[in-house]
Amino acid sequence: MSDRIDRDVINALIAGHFADPFSVLGMHQTTAGLEVRALLPDATEVWVIEPKTGRKVGKLECIDSRGFFSGVLPRRKNFFRYQLAVVWHGQQNLIDDPYRFGPLIQEMDAWLLSEGTHLRPYETLGAHADTMDGVTGTRFSVWAPNAQRVSVVGQFNYWDGRRHPMRLRKESGIWELFIPGAQHGQLYKFEMIDAHGKLRIKADPYAFEAQMRPETASLICGLPEKVVQTEERKQANRFDAPVSIYEVHLGSWRRHTDNNFWLSYRELADQLIPYVKWMGFTHLELLPVNEHPFDGSWGYQPTGLYAPTRRFGTRDDFRYFINAAHQAGLNVILDWVPGHFPSDDFGLADFDGTKLYEHSDPREGYHQDWNTLIYNYGRREVSNYLVGNALYWIERFGIDALRVDAVASMIYRDYSRKEGEWIPNEFGGRENLEAIEFLRNTNRILGEQVSGAVSMAEESTDFAGVSRPQDMGGLGFWYKWNLGWMHDTLDYMKLDPVHRQYHHDKLTFGMLYNYTENFVLPLSHDEVVHGKKSILDRMPGDAWQKFANLRAYYGWMWAFPGKKLLFMGNEFAQGREWNHDASLDWHLLEGGDNWHHGVQRLVRDLNHTYRHHKALHELDFDAYGFEWLVVDDNERSVLIFVRRDKVGNEIIVASNFTPVPRHDYRFGINQPGKWREIVNTDSMHYHGSNTGNGGVVHSDEIASHGRQHSLSLTLPPLATIWLVREGE
């Protein structure tokens, strides 16, 4: 044999330490002629086969008993398609040689991936079914620029890293290989010799499906088809649309009563979605569904950013669930976690032996609160991985909005860190400039590529312009959670009513900054865990007063400017904190009609009334849409305001946050006439005392509060009422 392969190369190849397998394996032109080489551990005999005729072209000689074969093909001068007939343990198998195929990734894709500007990197990286030269199989690719060798291991090769070492594309740091016969549903991982010579086995960062914990392999699974954005779904996200969000943790909304096991995606489609629709919500927000190893993280520590968790079924089951939501007229919001990732060995941590996805300095790359790692947004390939993921969920699953978790932890380098535990940016400041640019870029691309889909920020500081356009210096989100409103109002509501007069500003302060952002008013999962108590249990007083306070608060919230968000269980006043390992307390709604039914009916009525009246949602972010009528009656803890639509139709909202009914309470109004009470949280329908105004009241030409006309109302105890004008 001429051009004999060096024994050291064979040893390195068999040991799994050779970085350029295509320079050795496959078909090569040598001085002796056309030569085929193959590494086939445990094989005893190998023939080169002509596929069209099935004729044996030549036999490969066993050069090394560990499985290295080579042979020159007589009378063959030009490259041709071939197969290998391999005898393993007495059985002959006909296989296609992975090393006869050329480079997989197109030069333009490789360049865009290296530049970090490939809009859809998941279409190139990961595992994709393909047909090459008439051969079906799967093409694999993974970014690991500092690895010494990378192999695909899986069910198709006995998890043996010697059998399928990959080709390194040095210009991009991407390893690639087409494996004939690797099929949909088979498990795989990437085995690599890392930068320090250590053996690592990693799940695919771009896997479209993965095993459920405690198993960690990726699944070969084709790229899901695109989901068309409908005009109705786009309209439902608009600033002037009614947006009422039901936030759900799929693993604990409801469970099987016999074994406490989760409902599947399809069972949730049959049970959860009709319930959310019946309750009148417009949007369904899901706590993260990305694959994650630790149940107690609620999904906020993902390892499979492109894979829906298998806890509740397959990827196609999840697509079925989303489609069912759309068919019911619900938009779907996905909690998205681009801020950090866990340090599990099979995940992104130390991916190729270097800090590839994270920062090398723990003062930048380690999150102390959650024991997680922070993405290095300044590395183009990393930010591209994340931006592509945002598009992936919207385009390939039909997600209508992304709610970005823990934005403050991303944009501040000193977040939850003491002096000396963080590194300033290049200008000496505390802002994470790379994270800010990443968020702006992500939102810009969403606006350009999937117009109508939106993003929402959970941002807990006063960072300016979170929901303002990038060209105005903002981050470009469409909406921001108003955590200040949430804290202030809950702090107010937990007070004994006798003390509320001294904290009146906690309910009024929100309007001083209301138009600085496009706000969502959130009563989220974070407010019913870790000893904070349930929303109901924070209310003061005896049982009657607790429920009355809660109903009054909900009436206030649904009328206040801003979109609405309510975590599951709060809609029927669950008494205990949320437990991710158990179902909600649905038994509270069993038996006879009770206070919990009353709250549930109220939330349903609030949703339907809110959606019906444009004054309650059309001008959330326009000062014309809100006006105080009574803002200074702190002694009686009464607040009254007007909500207004674009053409001037008004709804009056009056709240009495004391247990004392206020009879003949007069206040000035803008529009005289007949006003109908459309919501009264003290109604007997909601198990209140049924104090009210008999349905209809008429204005008087009596001046009050600087206005010529006024209304005289009975304000029920611990209640909120809404009134709509019906005419002169």
Curated annotation (Swiss-Prot):
Protein name per its UniProtKB record: 1,4-alpha-glucan branching enzyme GlgB
Any one annotated GO CC term: cytosol
Gene name, Swiss-Prot/TrEMBL: glgB
GO biological process, one term: glycogen biosynthetic process
Family under the similarity heading: Belongs to the glycosyl hydrolase 13 family. GlgB subfamily.
Molecular function in Gene Ontology: 1,4-alpha-glucan branching enzyme activity; cation binding; hydrolase activity, hydrolyzing O-glycosyl compounds
SUPFAM superfamilies for the chain: (Trans)glycosidases, E set domains, Glycosyl hydrolase domain
UniProt cross-references to Pfam families, sorted A to Z: Alpha-amylase, Alpha-amylase_C, CBM_48, GlgB_N
Gene3D superfamilies, sorted: Glycosidases (3.20.20.80), Golgi alpha-mannosidase II (2.60.40.1180), Immunoglobulins (2.60.40.10)
Known catalytic reactions: Transfers a segment of a (1->4)-alpha-D-glucan chain to a primary hydroxy group in a similar glucan chain
Pathway membership: Glycan biosynthesis; glycogen biosynthesis
Role this protein plays: Catalyzes the formation of the alpha-1,6-glucosidic linkages in glycogen by scission of a 1,4-alpha-linked oligosaccharide from growing alpha-1,4-glucan chains and the subsequent attachment of the oligosaccharide to the alpha-1,6 position.
Self-association state and partner proteins as the record states: Monomer.
Lineage: Bacteria, Pseudomonadati, Pseudomonadota, Gammaproteobacteria, Enterobacterales
PANTHER family tied to this protein: 1,4-ALPHA-GLUCAN-BRANCHING ENZYME (PTHR43651:SF3)
Organism expressing this protein natively: Citrobacter koseri (strain ATCC BAA-895 / CDC 4225-83 / SGSC4696)
UniProt keyword terms in alphabetical order: Carbohydrate metabolism, Glycogen biosynthesis, Glycogen metabolism, Glycosyltransferase, Transferase
Enzyme Commission numbers on file: 2.4.1.18
Active site as annotated: D405, E458
